[in-house]
């Protein structure tokens, strides 16, 4: 069984809540276990929580769940680009998959509502990566 940790952004919680529920349902469908969940204020705050979970022996992969909606400035792009870069670095540093389930940047609230399956897709990617990495070890 694949043990997952979820790191979930509270910002835009109405959307990340739906993303989280879809992700949980898909994890159960795939036979994966969500053994740890941590809420963080926003997507930019995820890396430290991810690092902490990756240090646990009972975590095979991390699923990130966040939603960054476009504003009047380029803030959304800065948040997602920096978070994604650090998330990828952590995956490589710890040798464990960290799946990017962050919707955005550059999307409206309506587009965000259409993309609530990003959490589900991240679960799919995390479980596949764990299984495929085990095949080559």
Swiss-Prot record:
The entry's keywords: Riboflavin biosynthesis, Transferase
Recorded catalytic activity of this chain's protein: (2S)-2-hydroxy-3-oxobutyl phosphate + 5-amino-6-(D-ribitylamino)uracil = 6,7-dimethyl-8-(1-D-ribityl)lumazine + phosphate + 2 H2O + H(+)
Pfam families, per the entry: DMRL_synthase (PF00885)
Gene Ontology process terms (BP): riboflavin biosynthetic process
EC numbers, comma separated: 2.5.1.78
GO cellular component: riboflavin synthase complex
Residues where (2S)-2-hydroxy-3-oxobutyl phosphate binds: 72-73, 115
Pathway involvement of the protein, from the record: Cofactor biosynthesis; riboflavin biosynthesis; riboflavin from 2-hydroxy-3-oxobutyl phosphate and 5-amino-6-(D-ribitylamino)uracil: step 1/2
Highest taxon above the source species: Archaea
Catalytic residues identified in the record: 75
Residues annotated as binding 5-amino-6-(D-ribitylamino)uracil: 11, 43-45, 67-69, 100
A molecular-function term among this protein's GO annotations: 6,7-dimethyl-8-ribityllumazine synthase activity
InterPro entries per the UniProt record, alphabetical: LS, LS/RS, LS/RS_sf
Matches recorded under Gene3D superfamilies: Lumazine/riboflavin synthase (3.40.50.960)
Family: Belongs to the DMRL synthase family.
Subunit structure of this chain's protein: Forms an icosahedral capsid composed of 60 subunits, arranged as a dodecamer of pentamers.
Task of the protein: Catalyzes the formation of 6,7-dimethyl-8-ribityllumazine by condensation of 5-amino-6-(D-ribitylamino)uracil with 3,4-dihydroxy-2-butanone 4-phosphate. This is the penultimate step in the biosynthesis of riboflavin.
Listed name of the protein: 6,7-dimethyl-8-ribityllumazine synthase
């Amino acid at each position: 069984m694949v043990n997952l940790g979820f790191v979930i952004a509270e910002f835009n919680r109405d959307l990340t809540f739906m993303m989280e529920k879809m992700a949980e349902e898909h994890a159960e469908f795939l036979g994966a276990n969500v053994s740890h969940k941590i809420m963080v204020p926003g997507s930019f705050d995820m890396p430290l929580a991810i690092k902490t979970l990756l240090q646990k022996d009972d975590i095979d992969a991390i699923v990130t769940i966040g939603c960054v909606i476009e504003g009047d400035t380029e803030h959304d792009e800065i948040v997602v680009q920096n978070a994604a870069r650090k998330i990828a670095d952590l995956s490589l540093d710890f040798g464990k998959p960290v799946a990017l389930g962050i919707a955005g940047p550059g999307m409206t609230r309506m587009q965000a509502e259409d993309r609530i399956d990003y959490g589900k897709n991240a679960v799919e990617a995390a479980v596949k990566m764990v299984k495929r990495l085990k095949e080559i070890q």
